[in-house]
Amino acid sequence: MKVVDPQAFDETGTKMSQYRLLVFSRWCQVMLRFEKGMYENPEQDLNKLWWDMVEKYQGLRRPAGRNAPDYGAKYHIVGAPVYYHNYMMGQLFASQVHATIAKEVYSGAHPDTVTYVNEPKVGEFM
């Protein structure tokens, strides 16, 4: 595949990444707030709590007439409790490191324009 305008391709990729993180941040809010509420009161209707969080943070409506333990589809709750927000923390940390590399190694270049290919200074900085 030949890219006709590499700059437009880079800009589109950057926008897609930004949108993906915005959507993911809302999903992380659902998981974090659901788990917090679940541990505060494990006797409550957890499906209601789940859909309350989904509606509030993702803007999705619960299916009419559905009353199944949809929260159970997220196995993270059992296998790695109170962990899901770490995915977002990792994204935030990676973004901060990248911005710092752009500032320190690439003399203040905009982070969207920086790549690490053939740049040993990045390794030295790290």
Short names for language-model regions:
Residues 3-12, 20-126:
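C-terminal, non-catalytic "cap/extension" segments appended to globular domains
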Residues 16:
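Active-site region of the double-stranded beta-helix
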